[in-house]
Regions:
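HDAC/HDAC-like amidohydrolase catalytic core signature
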Residues: 1-110
Length: 110
């Protein structure tokens, strides 16, 4: 069985503030540890049509999230989710990673 890691550097720009578990240092530490495993397949997120988001989320929700990313500083999207200017690219790459993973499994690449 092959295992893939689908990732980009955008995740380190998703800032959530001190004390929050989603930290760039954590992502970097995990990535560095995984790079030691030579049997993993590394890939980048897929590009995708943004309309695909509306197949799994309400259109109003998708539009609200797209408009919510701050130009500076941190912002609560809801009671649990903190976003920053870098969160937009990180979210796009997260969706692209899921799409790449599904495609890779379907095509038996991993």
């Amino acid at each position: 069985m092959k295992t893939a890691i689908i990732s980009s550097k955008a995740s380190v720009n998703h800032l959530t503030g001190d004390g929050h578990p989603e930290q760039p240092k954590r992502v970097t530490a995990i990535t560095e540890r995984l790079k030691k495993n030579k049997s993993l397949i590394w890939d980048k997120p897929a590009s995708f049509d943004q309309n695909i988001l509306k197949k799994v989320h309400d259109e109003n929700y998708v539009d609200m999230v797209k408009k919510s990313f701050p130009n500076q500083g941190l912002k609560f999207l809801d009671g649990d989710t903190i976003i920053s200017p870098g969160s937009k690219d990180a979210t796009v790459d997260a969706v692209g990673s899921v799409i790449k993973a599904i495609d890779g499994v379907e095509q038996k690449k991993f």
